[in-house]
A protein has these predicted regions:
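Active-site gating/metal-coordination segments in enzymes
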Residues: 150, 156-208, 232, 236-237, ...
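Acidic, glycine-enriched loop/beta-strand segments at the rims
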Residues: 30-32, 47-60, 73, 322, ...
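Histidine-rich, glycine-flanked metal-binding segment
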Residues: 29-38, 47, 51-92
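Active-site neighborhoods of metal-dependent hydrolases
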Residues: 172-194, 243-366
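Bacterial N-terminal signal peptides
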Residues: 12-24
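Divalent metal-dependent hydrolysis catalytic cores, especially in the metallo-beta-lactamase
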Residues: 109-131, 142-152, 181-191, 216, ...
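Short, acidic/polar
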Residues: 103-110, 162-176, 221-228
Length: 432
């Protein structure tokens, strides 16, 4: 697995450390190829390869030993290959959630059946165990899992550890990296004045200590000024939208200078306020096939809905969602790599699997084209996770992670929900 660090650390002084610690990065990696059956030839499909290039019409996709051997319109089908007629179907790469949260192995199947074959779980107490379980799982039953472990925070809330001084921050990062996280996450947020916010010298220490040991960093952030401070401190990944103000030229320049990735998590905001009433997607058959009835009941409880109607925080996030959407469009237009993320599983009503598809819908509502939205959940997300040499696009040599759709998502992004089959590493994901 190529663990190139290109554009991650433009600081020559730590180049040797990065080289020595490269194997720490994304240590789990995609699981070994599971497909060992006959060579497959998927014939006649429309292939959207995840690079942003135009769709390949009437394409042939060759799968051998769990990897892509060839894809294109003029592809020779190997002798003895299993020929699969995919006429009228659209094949896309397996989707990548570049910001979600796992808390139980039972959630693996939910993500997979909804076409999410890779997930970055950005903060939680059980994440290292879940990464191990995913790596050891029967082929076709678990996504590729990447994790951050405990979040470096100002307050010890669930899934986080409190660090209040630079020395505490350095020690906490040193403790964390013994488990080889795929990213070190820092949270800079006072939750609309509800608790203290991490000071700049503390998050600087988190980022520096992670970088010194060869680990990249991601940030939970809300406000533009905090996001700029984190960028100046060297953060590698902005894992939420800037929501208080429109981003400016300075912010965009800081993002470009260090090739920082951006995950909008628009549905995170939606989940904060949408349950003031029963949302329309509660009647969507695609949602209902995987939704947890108990969680639905909690969101439909009249007392909970009344609480959401009267919650000042919910109102703030609802009022500021349009800003987040404008910022996504501005950053995409500026050439920043967008990585689809949702914060699914990170709070009440953030339904895993479905919210990834809803996020794509909201990305297009923000002004992205369906192709741009798809790339954010495939090739773009793979770049953000530093795994684009393995997954994210349907190209020769990549893992055979793909989704077969009955309708074209370039016509309507909601067609990503028209899932007929999901494959990971050349193995078909079983139905529920």
């Amino acid at each position: 697995m190529n663990l190139s660090r290109k554009n991650c650390f433009p600081f020559a002084g730590i180049a040797g450390v990065i080289l020595l610690n490269a194997l720490n990065l994304f240590a789990a990696g995609p699981k070994p190829d599971g497909g060992s059956g006959p060579v497959q030839a998927w014939v006649g499909a429309r292939v959207i390869d995840g690079t942003g290039k135009p769709a390949i019409e009437n394409a042939t996709l060759i799968i051998r030993n769990g990897r892509i051997e060839a894809v294109g319109r003029r592809v020779k089908i190997p002798a003895g290959a299993e020929r699969i007629d995919a006429t009228g179907k659209t094949i896309i790469p397996g989707l990548i959630c570049a910001h979600g949260h796992l808390s139980d192995a039972a959630q693996f199947g939910v993500y997979l059946r909804d076409g999410i074959t890779t997930i970055l779980s950005l903060g939680g107490a059980k994440e290292f165990d879940l990464r191990d379980q995913s790596a050891k799982a029967t082929p076709g039953t678990a996504p590729h899992v990447y994790v951050a472990g405990l979040i470096q925070d100002s307050t010890a809330i669930p899934g986080a550890v409190a660090v209040k001084t630079p020395d505490e921050a350095r020690k906490s990062v040193d403790d964390l990296i013994r488990n080889k996280p795929d990213l070190v996450k820092v949270r800079v947020d006072d939750f609309l004045g509800a608790r203290p916010k991490m000071a700049p010298d503390v998050y600087q220490a988190v980022i520096d200590e992670a970088h010194k040991n060869g680990f990249r960093t991601a940030a939970h952030v809300v406000l533009l000024d905090d996001a700029k401070g984190l960028l100046r401190a060297g953060v590698d990944y902005i894992a939420h939208s800037v929501r208080d103000r429109d981003v400016d030229d300075e912010f965009i320049a800081l993002m470009k200078k260090r090739h920082v990735f951006y995950s909008p998590t628009l549905t995170r905001e939606l989940a904060v306020f949408t349950y003031a009433e029963t949302p329309s997607f509660f009647s969507d058959p695609f949602f209902l096939k995987e939704a947890d009835p108990a969680e639905m009941a909690r969101m439909e409880d009249p007392k909970y809905q009344e609480k959401m109607r009267n919650d000042a925080g919910a109102k703030w996030y609802k009022d500021h969602l349009p800003i987040a959407m404008r910022n996504l469009k501005a950053l995409s237009d500026a050439g920043i790599v967008i990585a689809m993320g949702t914060d699914s599983g990170g709070g009440p009503g953030r339904f895993q699997g479905y919210f990834e598809h809803l996020e794509l819908e909201y990305e297009t509502k923000a002004g992205l084209t369906p192709m741009q939205a798809l790339v954010s959940a495939t090739g773009g997300a793979a770049k953000a996770l530093n795994i684009s040499n393995q997954v994210g696009t349907l190209e020769k040599g990549k893992q055979a992670d793909f989704v077969v759709l009955s309708a074209n998502p370039l016509d309507d992004i909601k067609n990503t929900r028209s899932i007929e089959q999901v494959w990971i590493g050349g193995v078909r994901v079983p139905a529920k």
